[in-house]
Amino acid sequence: MSNLWNGPLKKIDEWRWLIPRDYKKGMLTEGLIFANERMIGEIRKDQAPEQVANVACLPGIVGYSLAMPDIHWGYGFPIGGVGATLIDKGVISPGGVGFDINCGVRVIKTSLCSKEGIPKKEALLTTLFHSIPSGVGSEGRIKFSIPELKKVLIDGAKAIIQRGFGWNEDELMIEEQGAMAGADPTAVSEKAFERGKSQLGTLGSGNHFLEIETVKQIFDPHIAKIFGLFPDQVLIMIHTGSRGFGHQVCTDHLRVMQNAMRKYNIQLPDRQLACAPFHSSEGQQYFSAMVCAANFAWANRQLITHWVRESFEKVFNRSAQDLGMSILYDVAHNIAKIEQHQINEKILKLCVHRKGATRSFGPGQRDLPDKYRSVGQPVLIPGDMGTGSFILCGMARSMEESFGSACHGAGRVMSRSEADRSAKGRNIANELEEKGVLVMAESNATLREEIPAAYKDVGEVVTVVEKAGLARRIVYAQPIAVMKE
Protein backbone atom coordinates (compact mmCIF):
# COMPACT_ATOMS: atom_id res chain seq x y z
CA MET A 1 0.00 0.00 0.00
CA SER A 2 1.34 3.42 -0.98
CA ASN A 3 2.13 5.87 1.81
CA LEU A 4 2.06 8.84 -0.57
CA TRP A 5 0.19 11.91 0.64
CA ASN A 6 -2.17 13.13 -2.07
CA GLY A 7 -3.79 16.04 -0.27
CA PRO A 8 -4.07 19.57 -1.68
CA LEU A 9 -1.12 21.97 -1.63
CA LYS A 10 -1.40 25.52 -2.92
CA LYS A 11 1.86 27.13 -4.00
CA ILE A 12 2.12 30.60 -2.43
CA ASP A 13 5.60 31.32 -3.76
CA GLU A 14 8.82 29.40 -4.45
CA TRP A 15 9.33 28.63 -0.76
CA ARG A 16 5.86 28.30 0.82
CA TRP A 17 3.02 25.79 0.29
CA LEU A 18 -0.44 26.00 1.85
CA ILE A 19 -2.72 23.19 3.03
CA PRO A 20 -6.18 24.82 2.85
CA ARG A 21 -8.35 24.91 5.95
CA ASP A 22 -11.18 23.08 4.20
CA TYR A 23 -8.93 20.08 3.46
CA LYS A 24 -10.32 18.17 6.43
CA LYS A 25 -12.96 18.55 9.09
CA GLY A 26 -11.77 20.12 12.32
CA MET A 27 -8.97 22.29 10.91
CA LEU A 28 -8.99 25.65 12.67
CA THR A 29 -6.31 27.20 10.48
CA GLU A 30 -4.25 26.46 7.37
CA GLY A 31 -1.10 24.39 7.24
CA LEU A 32 2.04 25.99 5.83
CA ILE A 33 5.10 24.05 4.63
CA PHE A 34 8.38 25.80 3.85
CA ALA A 35 9.95 23.96 0.89
CA ASN A 36 10.96 24.26 -2.75
CA GLU A 37 9.19 22.42 -5.56
CA ARG A 38 11.66 19.52 -5.67
CA MET A 39 11.42 18.99 -1.91
CA ILE A 40 7.61 18.92 -2.01
CA GLY A 41 7.84 15.76 -4.11
CA GLU A 42 9.95 14.17 -1.36
CA ILE A 43 7.71 15.49 1.42
CA ARG A 44 4.66 13.87 -0.21
CA LYS A 45 6.31 10.44 0.14
CA ASP A 46 5.11 10.03 3.73
CA GLN A 47 2.17 11.25 5.81
CA ALA A 48 3.96 14.21 7.42
CA PRO A 49 1.74 16.74 5.57
CA GLU A 50 -1.30 14.97 7.05
CA GLN A 51 0.23 15.58 10.47
CA VAL A 52 0.56 19.29 9.61
CA ALA A 53 -3.19 19.29 8.89
CA ASN A 54 -3.90 17.39 12.12
CA VAL A 55 -1.95 19.92 14.19
CA ALA A 56 -4.17 22.63 12.66
CA CYS A 57 -7.04 21.02 14.61
CA LEU A 58 -5.53 21.72 18.05
CA PRO A 59 -7.83 23.86 20.22
CA GLY A 60 -6.53 27.41 20.54
CA ILE A 61 -4.04 27.22 17.65
CA VAL A 62 -3.14 30.61 16.15
CA GLY A 63 -1.33 31.50 12.94
CA TYR A 64 -0.49 28.57 10.69
CA SER A 65 0.33 24.98 11.56
CA LEU A 66 3.91 25.18 10.30
CA ALA A 67 6.44 22.73 8.89
CA MET A 68 10.10 23.41 8.17
CA PRO A 69 11.84 22.07 5.02
CA ASP A 70 13.43 19.23 7.02
CA ILE A 71 9.93 17.88 7.78
CA HIS A 72 9.35 14.13 8.04
CA TRP A 73 6.85 11.88 9.77
CA GLY A 74 6.94 11.84 13.59
CA TYR A 75 4.83 11.05 16.65
CA GLY A 76 1.82 13.41 16.69
CA PHE A 77 3.48 16.48 15.22
CA PRO A 78 5.73 15.94 12.23
CA ILE A 79 9.42 16.34 12.93
CA GLY A 80 10.04 19.87 11.72
CA GLY A 81 6.64 21.02 13.01
CA VAL A 82 5.80 24.27 14.81
CA GLY A 83 2.42 25.03 16.39
CA ALA A 84 1.47 27.91 18.68
CA THR A 85 -1.58 27.84 20.94
CA LEU A 86 -3.15 30.51 23.13
CA ILE A 87 -2.16 30.17 26.78
CA ASP A 88 -5.64 31.05 28.06
CA LYS A 89 -7.79 29.16 25.52
CA GLY A 90 -5.45 26.61 24.00
CA VAL A 91 -3.81 23.28 24.75
CA ILE A 92 -0.37 21.82 25.28
CA SER A 93 0.52 18.53 23.57
CA PRO A 94 3.47 16.23 24.39
CA GLY A 95 3.35 15.14 20.73
CA GLY A 96 4.39 18.71 19.88
CA VAL A 97 7.65 18.26 21.78
CA GLY A 98 8.48 14.59 21.35
CA PHE A 99 10.15 11.97 23.50
CA ASP A 100 13.65 13.47 23.48
CA ILE A 101 12.72 16.67 25.28
CA ASN A 102 15.24 19.45 24.58
CA CYS A 103 17.23 17.44 22.17
CA GLY A 104 19.45 20.28 21.06
CA VAL A 105 22.78 21.48 19.78
CA ARG A 106 25.69 23.29 21.40
CA VAL A 107 28.73 24.67 19.59
CA ILE A 108 32.00 25.28 21.41
CA LYS A 109 34.53 27.58 19.76
CA THR A 110 38.31 27.28 19.87
CA SER A 111 41.19 29.58 18.91
CA LEU A 112 42.70 26.68 16.92
CA CYS A 113 42.85 26.49 13.14
CA SER A 114 42.68 23.33 11.05
CA LYS A 115 46.45 22.92 10.65
CA GLU A 116 46.60 22.59 14.45
CA GLY A 117 43.46 20.46 14.79
CA ILE A 118 43.69 17.96 11.92
CA PRO A 119 47.01 16.36 12.96
CA LYS A 120 45.56 15.83 16.44
CA LYS A 121 42.11 14.60 15.40
CA GLU A 122 42.77 10.93 16.14
CA ALA A 123 44.18 11.70 19.60
CA LEU A 124 41.28 14.08 20.27
CA LEU A 125 38.62 11.61 19.15
CA THR A 126 40.14 8.77 21.17
CA THR A 127 40.33 10.94 24.29
CA LEU A 128 36.76 12.18 23.83
CA PHE A 129 35.51 8.65 23.20
CA HIS A 130 36.96 7.47 26.51
CA SER A 131 35.82 10.59 28.40
CA ILE A 132 32.17 10.83 27.33
CA PRO A 133 29.88 7.78 27.67
CA SER A 134 27.65 7.09 24.67
CA GLY A 135 25.11 4.53 23.47
CA VAL A 136 21.76 3.14 24.58
CA GLY A 137 21.56 2.93 28.37
CA SER A 138 25.01 4.48 28.81
CA GLU A 139 25.74 5.75 32.32
CA GLY A 140 27.50 8.94 33.28
CA ARG A 141 30.79 9.28 35.11
CA ILE A 142 29.02 11.05 37.99
CA LYS A 143 26.09 9.54 39.86
CA PHE A 144 23.58 12.04 41.22
CA SER A 145 21.52 11.47 44.34
CA ILE A 146 17.79 12.23 44.08
CA PRO A 147 18.15 15.57 45.96
CA GLU A 148 21.08 16.52 43.69
CA LEU A 149 19.07 15.59 40.61
CA LYS A 150 16.12 17.68 41.81
CA LYS A 151 18.44 20.69 41.97
CA VAL A 152 19.55 19.99 38.39
CA LEU A 153 15.91 19.82 37.25
CA ILE A 154 15.28 23.30 38.66
CA ASP A 155 18.61 25.04 37.98
CA GLY A 156 19.70 23.26 34.79
CA ALA A 157 23.20 24.05 33.53
CA LYS A 158 23.79 26.41 36.45
CA ALA A 159 23.63 23.49 38.90
CA ILE A 160 26.44 21.80 36.95
CA ILE A 161 28.53 24.98 36.68
CA GLN A 162 28.21 25.52 40.44
CA ARG A 163 29.75 22.07 40.95
CA GLY A 164 32.83 23.18 39.04
CA PHE A 165 31.93 21.76 35.62
CA GLY A 166 31.97 24.94 33.60
CA TRP A 167 32.67 28.64 33.48
CA ASN A 168 30.37 31.28 34.99
CA GLU A 169 29.86 32.90 31.57
CA ASP A 170 28.69 29.61 30.01
CA GLU A 171 25.08 30.04 31.07
CA LEU A 172 24.82 33.39 29.25
CA MET A 173 25.33 31.59 25.94
CA ILE A 174 22.56 29.02 26.43
CA GLU A 175 18.93 29.43 25.40
CA GLU A 176 16.96 30.34 28.57
CA GLN A 177 20.41 30.66 30.20
CA GLY A 178 20.26 26.91 30.61
CA ALA A 179 17.42 26.93 33.14
CA MET A 180 13.84 27.36 31.97
CA ALA A 181 11.40 28.66 34.60
CA GLY A 182 8.48 26.53 35.76
CA ALA A 183 10.18 23.27 36.71
CA ASP A 184 8.45 21.18 39.38
CA PRO A 185 10.21 17.91 40.28
CA THR A 186 7.03 16.65 42.00
CA ALA A 187 5.51 16.31 38.50
CA VAL A 188 8.22 13.77 37.60
CA SER A 189 7.71 10.05 38.21
CA GLU A 190 9.97 7.86 40.31
CA LYS A 191 10.77 5.84 37.19
CA ALA A 192 12.00 8.98 35.39
CA PHE A 193 14.24 9.81 38.36
CA GLU A 194 15.68 6.29 38.31
CA ARG A 195 16.42 6.52 34.59
CA GLY A 196 17.90 10.00 34.86
CA LYS A 197 20.14 9.85 37.91
CA SER A 198 22.90 7.92 36.12
CA GLN A 199 22.58 9.44 32.63
CA LEU A 200 23.79 13.01 33.07
CA GLY A 201 26.92 13.59 31.01
CA THR A 202 26.13 10.97 28.35
CA LEU A 203 25.75 11.36 24.61
CA GLY A 204 23.18 8.66 23.94
CA SER A 205 22.46 6.84 20.70
CA GLY A 206 20.81 7.23 17.31
CA ASN A 207 21.43 10.58 15.62
CA HIS A 208 23.21 12.05 18.65
CA PHE A 209 26.85 12.89 18.08
CA LEU A 210 29.88 14.91 19.03
CA GLU A 211 31.70 16.40 16.07
CA ILE A 212 34.96 18.29 15.56
CA GLU A 213 34.60 20.65 12.60
CA THR A 214 36.52 23.33 10.75
CA VAL A 215 35.03 26.51 9.31
CA LYS A 216 35.18 26.20 5.52
CA GLN A 217 33.12 29.15 4.33
CA ILE A 218 32.01 32.47 5.78
CA PHE A 219 28.98 34.10 4.17
CA ASP A 220 28.66 37.17 6.42
CA PRO A 221 32.02 38.36 7.82
CA HIS A 222 30.43 41.06 10.00
CA ILE A 223 28.12 38.72 11.90
CA ALA A 224 30.76 35.95 11.92
CA LYS A 225 33.05 38.36 13.77
CA ILE A 226 30.32 39.12 16.32
CA PHE A 227 29.82 35.36 16.77
CA GLY A 228 33.60 34.94 17.25
CA LEU A 229 34.04 32.81 14.12
CA PHE A 230 36.94 32.95 11.65
CA PRO A 231 38.11 31.00 8.56
CA ASP A 232 39.59 27.54 9.20
CA GLN A 233 38.60 27.67 12.90
CA VAL A 234 38.17 24.42 14.83
CA LEU A 235 34.69 24.06 16.39
CA ILE A 236 33.03 21.32 18.44
CA MET A 237 29.34 20.53 17.95
CA ILE A 238 27.41 18.53 20.56
CA HIS A 239 24.00 17.06 19.65
CA THR A 240 22.14 15.30 22.45
CA GLY A 241 19.13 15.71 24.74
CA SER A 242 17.46 14.52 27.94
CA ARG A 243 18.17 10.82 27.42
CA GLY A 244 15.92 8.25 29.16
CA PHE A 245 14.74 10.88 31.63
CA GLY A 246 12.95 12.94 28.97
CA HIS A 247 11.61 9.82 27.28
CA GLN A 248 10.03 8.68 30.54
CA VAL A 249 8.52 12.12 31.22
CA CYS A 250 6.85 12.06 27.80
CA THR A 251 5.65 8.46 28.22
CA ASP A 252 4.17 9.17 31.66
CA HIS A 253 2.27 12.27 30.60
CA LEU A 254 0.95 10.88 27.32
CA ARG A 255 -1.08 8.43 29.39
CA VAL A 256 -2.46 11.30 31.48
CA MET A 257 -3.27 13.32 28.36
CA GLN A 258 -5.27 10.47 26.82
CA ASN A 259 -7.61 10.61 29.82
CA ALA A 260 -7.65 14.42 29.77
CA MET A 261 -8.96 14.38 26.19
CA ARG A 262 -12.06 12.54 27.38
CA LYS A 263 -12.38 14.71 30.49
CA TYR A 264 -12.32 17.98 28.51
CA ASN A 265 -14.20 16.57 25.49
CA ILE A 266 -11.35 17.31 23.08
CA GLN A 267 -11.70 15.51 19.76
CA LEU A 268 -8.78 15.31 17.35
CA PRO A 269 -8.07 13.25 14.21
CA ASP A 270 -4.96 11.62 15.75
CA ARG A 271 -4.71 10.23 19.28
CA GLN A 272 -0.95 10.89 19.16
CA LEU A 273 -1.85 14.57 19.53
CA ALA A 274 -3.25 13.86 23.02
CA CYS A 275 -3.39 17.18 24.85
CA ALA A 276 -4.98 19.15 27.67
CA PRO A 277 -5.84 22.81 28.21
CA PHE A 278 -2.62 24.61 29.10
CA HIS A 279 -3.97 25.89 32.42
CA SER A 280 -5.60 22.59 33.43
CA SER A 281 -3.96 20.49 36.15
CA GLU A 282 -2.90 17.95 33.49
CA GLY A 283 -1.49 20.66 31.24
CA GLN A 284 0.45 22.28 34.06
CA GLN A 285 1.77 18.95 35.33
CA TYR A 286 3.12 18.09 31.89
CA PHE A 287 4.59 21.56 31.34
CA SER A 288 6.36 21.46 34.72
CA ALA A 289 7.76 17.98 34.05
CA MET A 290 8.79 18.95 30.51
CA VAL A 291 10.69 21.96 31.89
CA CYS A 292 12.48 19.59 34.29
CA ALA A 293 13.53 17.46 31.31
CA ALA A 294 14.62 20.53 29.33
CA ASN A 295 16.80 21.64 32.24
CA PHE A 296 18.18 18.09 32.51
CA ALA A 297 19.25 18.30 28.85
CA TRP A 298 21.01 21.64 29.32
CA ALA A 299 22.81 20.18 32.33
CA ASN A 300 23.72 17.13 30.23
CA ARG A 301 25.30 19.25 27.49
CA GLN A 302 27.09 21.27 30.17
CA LEU A 303 28.76 18.19 31.66
CA ILE A 304 29.76 17.03 28.19
CA THR A 305 31.21 20.50 27.53
CA HIS A 306 33.39 20.15 30.63
CA TRP A 307 34.78 16.83 29.41
CA VAL A 308 35.32 18.20 25.90
CA ARG A 309 37.41 21.01 27.37
CA GLU A 310 39.26 18.54 29.58
CA SER A 311 40.01 16.32 26.56
CA PHE A 312 41.39 19.20 24.52
CA GLU A 313 43.54 20.26 27.47
CA LYS A 314 45.05 16.77 27.65
CA VAL A 315 45.81 16.55 23.95
CA PHE A 316 47.16 20.08 23.48
CA ASN A 317 48.68 20.45 26.95
CA ARG A 318 47.12 23.91 27.23
CA SER A 319 44.27 25.26 29.32
CA ALA A 320 40.76 25.44 27.85
CA GLN A 321 40.85 29.20 28.43
CA ASP A 322 44.08 29.46 26.44
CA LEU A 323 42.45 27.36 23.70
CA GLY A 324 39.53 29.83 23.57
CA MET A 325 36.92 27.16 24.31
CA SER A 326 33.92 29.39 24.97
CA ILE A 327 30.36 28.47 24.02
CA LEU A 328 29.04 30.03 20.82
CA TYR A 329 25.45 29.11 21.71
CA ASP A 330 23.19 26.26 22.80
CA VAL A 331 19.75 25.79 21.23
CA ALA A 332 16.83 23.46 21.92
CA HIS A 333 14.90 21.92 19.04
CA ASN A 334 12.29 19.79 20.90
CA ILE A 335 10.49 22.02 23.38
CA ALA A 336 7.30 23.96 24.25
CA LYS A 337 7.84 27.50 25.48
CA ILE A 338 5.72 30.41 26.67
CA GLU A 339 6.44 33.33 24.35
CA GLN A 340 4.81 36.57 23.25
CA HIS A 341 4.21 37.08 19.54
CA GLN A 342 2.33 39.63 17.46
CA ILE A 343 -0.65 38.18 15.59
CA ASN A 344 -2.89 40.54 13.58
CA GLU A 345 -1.41 43.56 15.38
CA LYS A 346 -2.09 42.04 18.82
CA ILE A 347 0.59 40.82 21.23
CA LEU A 348 -0.49 37.35 22.37
CA LYS A 349 0.92 35.05 25.03
CA LEU A 350 1.39 31.66 23.39
CA CYS A 351 2.63 28.16 24.02
CA VAL A 352 4.98 27.61 21.06
CA HIS A 353 5.60 23.93 20.34
CA ARG A 354 8.82 23.32 18.39
CA LYS A 355 9.43 19.71 17.45
CA GLY A 356 12.50 19.36 15.29
CA ALA A 357 12.62 23.14 14.90
CA THR A 358 15.09 25.69 16.26
CA ARG A 359 14.29 29.06 17.76
CA SER A 360 15.56 31.74 15.34
CA PHE A 361 14.87 35.05 17.05
CA GLY A 362 15.91 38.09 15.05
CA PRO A 363 17.55 41.36 16.12
CA GLY A 364 16.27 43.27 19.13
CA GLN A 365 14.71 40.38 21.03
CA ARG A 366 15.23 40.80 24.78
CA ASP A 367 15.60 37.05 25.34
CA LEU A 368 18.92 37.05 23.47
CA PRO A 369 22.37 37.52 25.02
CA ASP A 370 23.60 41.13 24.89
CA LYS A 371 26.34 40.06 22.49
CA TYR A 372 23.84 38.87 19.85
CA ARG A 373 20.88 41.17 20.40
CA SER A 374 21.82 43.62 17.65
CA VAL A 375 22.05 40.94 14.94
CA GLY A 376 19.90 37.97 16.02
CA GLN A 377 20.67 34.65 17.64
CA PRO A 378 22.95 31.89 16.32
CA VAL A 379 20.88 29.07 14.80
CA LEU A 380 22.86 25.82 14.83
CA ILE A 381 22.01 23.39 12.01
CA PRO A 382 23.82 20.03 11.88
CA GLY A 383 23.93 18.13 8.61
CA ASP A 384 25.06 14.53 8.24
CA MET A 385 28.41 12.88 9.00
CA GLY A 386 29.72 13.45 5.49
CA THR A 387 28.66 16.97 4.55
CA GLY A 388 28.90 19.35 7.49
CA SER A 389 26.86 21.93 9.34
CA PHE A 390 25.66 25.50 9.06
CA ILE A 391 25.58 28.28 11.60
CA LEU A 392 22.77 30.67 10.73
CA CYS A 393 21.50 33.89 12.28
CA GLY A 394 17.86 34.52 13.16
CA MET A 395 16.08 37.13 11.02
CA ALA A 396 13.43 39.69 11.93
CA ARG A 397 11.00 38.20 9.40
CA SER A 398 10.98 34.88 11.27
CA MET A 399 9.09 36.62 14.08
CA GLU A 400 6.25 37.30 11.62
CA GLU A 401 6.47 34.11 9.54
CA SER A 402 7.24 31.29 11.97
CA PHE A 403 6.99 32.42 15.60
CA GLY A 404 10.77 32.94 15.45
CA SER A 405 11.53 29.38 14.28
CA ALA A 406 13.72 27.72 11.65
CA CYS A 407 14.78 24.20 10.66
CA HIS A 408 16.82 21.93 12.95
CA GLY A 409 18.91 19.87 10.54
CA ALA A 410 18.86 18.00 7.27
CA GLY A 411 15.83 15.80 8.02
CA ARG A 412 15.65 12.08 7.25
CA VAL A 413 14.62 10.68 3.86
CA MET A 414 15.22 7.04 4.89
CA SER A 415 14.03 5.25 8.01
CA ARG A 416 16.74 3.73 10.18
CA SER A 417 15.88 0.24 8.94
CA GLU A 418 15.98 1.37 5.28
CA ALA A 419 19.35 3.03 5.81
CA ASP A 420 20.68 -0.06 7.58
CA ARG A 421 19.58 -2.29 4.69
CA SER A 422 21.05 0.01 2.04
CA ALA A 423 24.43 0.12 3.82
CA LYS A 424 24.74 -3.63 4.44
CA GLY A 425 28.18 -4.92 3.50
CA ARG A 426 29.71 -1.44 3.31
CA ASN A 427 32.42 -0.09 5.58
CA ILE A 428 30.93 3.31 6.35
CA ALA A 429 33.84 4.37 8.58
CA ASN A 430 36.30 3.74 5.73
CA GLU A 431 34.11 5.60 3.25
CA LEU A 432 34.02 8.63 5.54
CA GLU A 433 37.74 8.43 6.24
CA GLU A 434 38.37 8.66 2.49
CA LYS A 435 36.54 12.02 2.67
CA GLY A 436 38.79 13.14 5.54
CA VAL A 437 36.28 12.39 8.31
CA LEU A 438 37.49 10.14 11.13
CA VAL A 439 34.61 8.30 12.84
CA MET A 440 34.60 6.43 16.13
CA ALA A 441 31.48 4.52 17.20
CA GLU A 442 30.51 1.79 19.64
CA SER A 443 28.26 0.23 17.01
CA ASN A 444 28.62 -0.26 13.25
CA ALA A 445 24.83 -0.51 13.11
CA THR A 446 24.56 3.15 14.13
CA LEU A 447 26.90 4.18 11.32
CA ARG A 448 24.76 2.28 8.82
CA GLU A 449 21.56 3.90 10.16
CA GLU A 450 23.17 7.35 10.00
CA ILE A 451 24.72 7.17 6.53
CA PRO A 452 24.75 10.53 4.69
CA ALA A 453 22.25 9.20 2.11
CA ALA A 454 19.67 8.79 4.90
CA TYR A 455 19.35 12.59 5.09
CA LYS A 456 18.22 15.45 2.90
CA ASP A 457 20.76 17.89 1.52
CA VAL A 458 21.27 20.28 4.43
CA GLY A 459 22.39 23.00 2.01
CA GLU A 460 19.04 22.83 0.20
CA VAL A 461 17.17 22.94 3.52
CA VAL A 462 19.14 26.00 4.61
CA THR A 463 18.55 27.72 1.25
CA VAL A 464 14.77 27.43 1.73
CA VAL A 465 15.00 28.75 5.29
CA GLU A 466 17.10 31.70 4.09
CA LYS A 467 14.92 32.53 1.07
CA ALA A 468 11.81 32.38 3.28
CA GLY A 469 13.40 34.95 5.61
CA LEU A 470 13.62 32.73 8.71
CA ALA A 471 17.41 32.69 9.18
CA ARG A 472 20.45 33.54 7.08
CA ARG A 473 23.64 31.56 6.70
CA ILE A 474 26.75 32.90 8.40
CA VAL A 475 29.19 29.98 8.36
CA TYR A 476 29.57 26.51 6.86
CA ALA A 477 31.72 23.99 8.75
CA GLN A 478 32.93 20.55 7.65
CA PRO A 479 33.51 17.60 10.01
CA ILE A 480 37.00 16.21 10.55
CA ALA A 481 36.12 13.80 13.38
CA VAL A 482 32.80 12.35 14.59
CA MET A 483 31.94 10.43 17.75
CA LYS A 484 28.79 8.27 17.66
CA GLU A 485 27.26 5.51 19.78
Please tell me what each predicted stretch does:
Residues R106-T126:
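A glycine-rich phosphate/pyrophosphate-binding beta-strand-loop-alpha-helix module
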Residues C57, W73:
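Active-site beta-strand->loop segment that positions catalytic residues and contacts the acyl thioester
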Residues M1-Q51, I61-Y64, Y75-F77, I87-G96, ...:
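Domain-length cofactor-binding catalytic modules of enzymes
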Residues V82-K109:
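Redox-cofactor-proximal catalytic regions of oxidoreductases
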